[in-house]
């Protein structure tokens, strides 16, 4: 009678040990499956990175990368609101807003890496507190279909926005909420004899030049596609990358590098200070600067690489070559002066331009 009870006891022990072993072998994997949250623009950028860039990093590190979508201003506000207990680990911001984030103490210094060393000099932020993940410039875009129907020549200058024949056909992003709008205004201001330290010429000339032609001031560029489709928009500030996205959707738009030049626009990344996973966050940030990550972003989302070692072929290589040509007449703006004066400019813009 002892044998069956011993047998049952041994069997029960074996089962218990097997269950324990299974749980032990599973627990490290479960513990390692962490989630990193990254703030960035929604739409094309989010789809590109989620669908084609993050996967290799997620697989190699057994983690999940989740996008918190929003404009640069939205992402900055979220980071600032949770400064002492960050909900995000990394964030992408337009360069001007990134300088504000750095000034607010929201970013950790980038850790040294080969990818960081390889970047274009213009893609490295002061003190390496952030780094550019892609580069571009704000110039002019136009509705090719409308121009063809009207027999208009393609625009060549920022001052074409003031041509009376475009009355009610110009769409302009708000200076107060859009880097494209800010760039467009500042380059117009320079043509009028101003500088970032003196925007009086631009504000003074606007109501009698570009102002009368503007159909609508839009908070972001999201509405541009719709206004091109409906035949409302003839011309607007935009980047070659954004134009490429619209063309991929079948919209009749083209980019023009104005003869006065364009404004350099870099999308930067920074690791958020005091985040819950600093080591993984820095590892992700370094990966996103690598030629491999940037090649995927270029191929699938026309994101122009900040790392010149990124390999490109076919149409992507042609795009990079064209962008390098545009960069020859692209100009940088003074973000320190801009950020110091932006609140006053925004208030004046809202009161005198968008009233």
Feature map (PLM): residue ranges:
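Short beta-strand->loop
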Residues: 108-117, 129-131, 159, 235, ...
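Periplasmic-binding protein-like
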Residues: 136, 204-210, 217-218, 249-273, ...
